[in-house]
Amino acid sequence: MEKTYHFTGIKGSGMSALALMLHQMGKNVQGSDSTDYFFTQRGLEQAGVPLLPFDEKNIKPEFELIVGNAFRDDNNVEIAFAHKNGFPFKRYHEFLGHFMEDFTSIGVAGAHGKTSTTGMLAHVMSNIVDTSYLIGDGTGRGNAGSEYFVFESDEYERHFMPYHPEYTIMTNIDFDHPDYFEGIEDVTSAFQDYANNIKKGIFAYGEDVNLRKLSAKAPIYYYGFEANDDYRAENLIRSTRGSSFDAYFRGEKIGHFVVPAYGKHNVLNALSVVAVCHNLGLDMTDVADHLLTFRGVKRRFTEKKVGETVIIDDFAHHPTEIEATLDAARQKYPDREIVAVFQPHTFTRTIAFADEFAEVLDHADTVYLAQIYGSAREVDHHEITAQDLADKVRKPAKVIELDNVSPLLDHDRGVYVFMGAGNIQKYEIAFEKLLSQTSTNLQ
């Protein structure tokens, strides 16, 4: 009888991608989660993967049980039932560590840019050579016969330590997740441990001082804009249509590349993809062709229009990510008002980076803040509020509530950049409904 894989917490971005991969490989897959809508479930529904509410009746001793990293005995009935009955299970990252052993695997690690870079690398490689992939926006493709496996490698709680890929990209090292990491030295130590796992090659951003500190058995290739980088981007042109650059490997030009994406960070993401593909011996003309057709990943500078109003949805929830997202918006819309609508994610992160959040939000013309979205792992001790953060921002800033987003209407030709990792999309949906109603009333 064919084994059934049950995913507890299947709507998680990594979990849903892994479930889709196994489903496409012909495995029996099902999963459970809360009944709240999450953007990853659309792909699961389209694939016909059964989605169930959490219930101990979902767990059978013959199932292979894969559990999201956030779930424990005290917050999930399925885990409590499995423990009580002695049913074995693997955490997501433990299962993935074993899964990748059947492929030549390429991880993408970094405090920021993992999902976008994983998506870009997966898009390019899968159009050139048979490649399975797992992207942190909930997208996955699985083929047991694939030569390569591209996946997102997460540093939080050192979840990437079971991974021993042949290659990895490291986009940057930055202090985040203050509920777990003690500081930048702790984060750097985690990346050093991960670097020790890599078998054949590391591709690291050369202008990151902490990445420059790493040592490894595998060769380290640095990429960036400086003369001492192994892979270097030159002749960079950024316009309202995207970005283009020439790529060099140790002084030798390897190609000209155009990326229909915005922001300096996306040029670096593309350069890291070029570096990996060049090292693997893939044809650079093919790489250039498929970079040109990359359309991004879910919730990373995702654009839509409601009438003439531009709305951008982005997962940015760290100061570095907000800065990059607003830079991208400025590149594409240099003559329009940039309106940032930001929901801080977790109280610990908001406390740790309050001044940094205020500084980067000042890159927008006007700022709106949603109430802080607390993590299930923490308690609100009322040490900080969204209004406290608004008071630190120098540009015009105010707090809005989900039941009244009408202040957002006060901007003609505004480009609205909704950012956050919580439920900021609910504010976006409320604003879209308000725009539609306003438009109808004017007709």
Swiss-Prot record:
Subcellular location: Cytoplasm
InterPro entries listed in its UniProt record: Mur-like_cat_sf, Mur_ligase_C, Mur_ligase_C_dom_sf, Mur_ligase_cen, Mur_ligase_N, MurCDEF_pg_biosynth, UDP-N-AcMur_Ala_ligase_MurC
Keywords: ATP-binding, Cell cycle, Cell division, Cell shape, Cell wall biogenesis/degradation, Cytoplasm, Ligase, Nucleotide-binding, Peptidoglycan synthesis
Main location: cytoplasm
GO molecular function annotation: ATP binding; UDP-N-acetylmuramate-L-alanine ligase activity
CC per GO annotation: cytoplasm
Major enzyme class: ligase
PANTHER family hit by this protein: UDP-N-ACETYLMURAMATE--L-ALANINE LIGASE, UDP-N-ACETYLMURAMATE--L-ALANINE LIGASE-RELATED
NCBIfam families in the cross-refs: murC (TIGR01082)
Family from the record: Belongs to the MurCDEF family.
Role, per record: Cell wall formation.
Name of the protein: UDP-N-acetylmuramate--L-alanine ligase
Primary gene name: murC
